[in-house]
């Protein structure tokens, strides 16, 4: 299943041009030298959860974090040409994750993410 522009569909049901558009929309940004991939959407950026967890030195799998978030806060998205799928989190889910993290870097990361958000909203 692929979540593309807010709709979950079987990969075979998604036209190739839409899949490629999603893949081409993956952006890279750096926070304290660590790569964070995100997908700009109309409702704001969707950050690759594994990148966020890695940047903040979390020792938990993205699939475990996803269970603690609502469906509208975390979804599986296409991020690579070779059919790579990743759990991605929106700003609401990111805020929830960071507010319970206890990580001293959390406020700085959230501020950085809000700057990304400002640049993705039209």
Spans of features found by a protein language model:
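Basic, low-complexity intrinsically disordered segments
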Residues: 66-84
């Amino acid at each position: 299943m692929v979540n593309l522009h807010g709709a979950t569909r079987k990969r075979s049901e998604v036209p190739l041009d839409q899949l490629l558009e999603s893949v081409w929309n993956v952006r890279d940004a750096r926070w304290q030298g660590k790569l964070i991939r995100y997908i700009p959407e109309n409702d704001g950026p969707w950050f690759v959860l594994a990148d966020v967890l890695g940047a903040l030195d979390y020792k938990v799998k993205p699939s475990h974090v996803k269970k603690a978030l609502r469906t509208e806060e975390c979804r599986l998205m296409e991020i690579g040409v070779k059919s790579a799928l990743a759990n991605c989190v929106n700003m609401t889910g990111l805020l929830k994750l960071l507010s319970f993290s206890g990580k001293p870097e959390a406020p700085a990361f959230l501020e950085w993410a809000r700057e990304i958000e400002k640049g993705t909203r039209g």
